Amino acid sequence: MRAMGCEVQDARCGMSYRDLGIWKLARETAIAVHRMTLENLPKFEMYEEGSQIRRSAKSISANIVEGYGRRRYKQEFIRFLVFAHASCDETIEHLEMLFETGSLTNELVYGDLSAQLDLLGRKLNVFIDSVERSHRTGRSDISERASRIAHLAS
């Protein structure tokens, strides 16, 4: 969590969304889901549930990126992180549906993806809480600190 404040701040830290651990995990998960649909699903699912789960998995990292791009505005950042979390939940639902209907029969693949999505959802919750508590935008925080210091000095 050392860099969390820096992650949430802005360009002063020289960071990109690519530096966010949560984005990296979301991206890895989307790639794993994509591969699962190509390697483990029957052909008839490729354009049905397979398409749905690919889109919802890719939406997680895409919403993190879009939120990060709007990080100057705390509520916008949080809004897109909440969208990312909702997409994570949607992806879990699609995965469970594929497994329970017998379209995904590989229990190891199901278990690994399920655990990865569960971890991602928990980490998204922690990240959202962190942004809510420690959001920094740069200039406004400097002005606020300067006002507090001026008030204490008088």
Q: Can you say where each PLM-predicted feature lies in the sequence?
A:
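Amphipathic alpha-helical assembly/interaction segments
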Residues: M1-S154
